[in-house]
């Protein structure tokens, strides 16, 4: 974690990464902008994994006074530059549309983001760089959703529209998130993206059969 301080007037156009500049994290009532480099990093990873057309930061850094004006404590992760509320956009059949929060939260889980993830509502998601994992639903009094966004969102009636290929280590191992994604594909709940086809053999329709799913599960638990 490295929190850097910028001036909106002087540094607003400074590029932080391929897809983000300083002023996107700005607070309305101050020239000061604080940004955690780890936050920028995970936003870039999310952008790539979801193949976004853009990510809109609806709330980045907040001064303590601005945070309180929103009914918050004035001491949260936004006030230290460690949080961002976002909408993620992509193209579907030539039309730009927002990802549902289910897609974003599940993507962050698959990316291994064991910090703060909050489903605000609908398409809006909160991300922060706290040192401990806390995944929560703001619509349910900020209560923890547990350790699996896929299960939680399914119970809420939200199906992830496109799974994300998880990281595979140098030994070709995958984790339980990858295994679940492949199993979902094998029973027709989701389809694989081009990036995912390297995970297992797929047929011409992009489906994974039960043999592939079983192999991935065995890899996930270290039996293969």
Residues covered by each model-derived region:
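Stable alpha-helical elements in mature extracytoplasmic
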Residues: 35-42, 100-104, 178, 212-213
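Extracytoplasmic cell-surface/polysaccharide-interacting catalytic and binding patches
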Residues: 1-51, 131, 142-149, 154-158
């Amino acid at each position: 974690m490295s929190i850097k301080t910028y001036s909106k007037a002087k540094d607003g156009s400074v590029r932080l990464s391929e897809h983000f500049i300083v002023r996107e994290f700005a607070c309305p009532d101050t020239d000061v902008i604080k940004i955690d480099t780890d936050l920028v990093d995970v936003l870039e990873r999310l952008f790539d994994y979801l193949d976004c057309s853009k990510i809109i930061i609806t709330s980045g850094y907040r001064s303590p006074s601005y945070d309180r004006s929103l009914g918050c404590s004035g001491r949260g992760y936004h006030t230290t530059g460690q949080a961002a509320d976002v909408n993620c956009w992509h193209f579907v059949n030539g039309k730009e549309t927002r990802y549902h929060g289910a897609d974003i939260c599940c993507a962050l889980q698959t990316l291994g983001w064991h910090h703060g993830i909050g489903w605000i509502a609908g398409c809006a998601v909160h991300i922060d760089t706290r040192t401990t994992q806390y995944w929560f639903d703001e619509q349910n009094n900020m209560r923890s959703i547990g350790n699996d966004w896929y299960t939680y969102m399914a119970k809420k009636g939200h199906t992830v529209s496109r799974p994300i290929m998880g990281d595979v280590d140098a030994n070709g191992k995958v984790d339980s998130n990858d295994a679940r994604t492949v199993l979902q594909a094998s029973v027709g709940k989701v389809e694989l993206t081009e990036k995912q086809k390297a995970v297992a053999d797929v047929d011409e329709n992009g489906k994974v059969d039960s043999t592939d799913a079983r192999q991935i599960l065995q890899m996930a638990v270290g039996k293969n």
